[in-house]
Amino acid sequence: MVEFTITGEELWNRMERAVEKVNQRLRKTVAILEEAKVPYAVIGGHAVRAWVAQVDEAAMRTTQDVDVLVRPSDLPAVIQAMTSAGLHHRNTTGLDMFVEHPDASARDAVHVLLVGNVERGGEPNPDIEPAARANDFQTVELRTLVRMKLNAFRRKDQVHLLDMISLGIIDRSWADQYPDPLRLRLEELLNDPDG
């Protein structure tokens, strides 16, 4: 059983530091890839956060790791750029990731997903183009991001989709843009947004 052993200012600092570390990791990753001129797209929870921020700052959620999508031919350049910046490359069960310390948790990592790879038995990952440019960084178009979230459809993906539904970013008109089973997954969330 977990008990409160960390309290007071130490607890506040720990909670704030966790969020700030993720934000710094995202900014550092983007700066490295931009400087190296390696094509990429921020995906996952941070891409959702960027889209949600366009509508309601209070609705944003953070996520533990940073996910980027790159083309397989650019992976060597990503490895070179990230390791030159002091990050440690690791490949765990086929997933390339970068951590700040060799013994760091995969939760504290930058995960690199490859265009064309099939994740969790779904569709192949999309290309990074067409892209959406958010001034300082690149992400995928909203339609592509929604498709990726419908494809993965883990609980956290469902929550991200529900956040976008609750803000009106996604509505019933989106369902016809996707083939089954993705359309059915979206309709499931639209029909019962409270679970």
Locate predicted features:
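Compositionally biased terminal segments of proteins
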Residues: 1-195
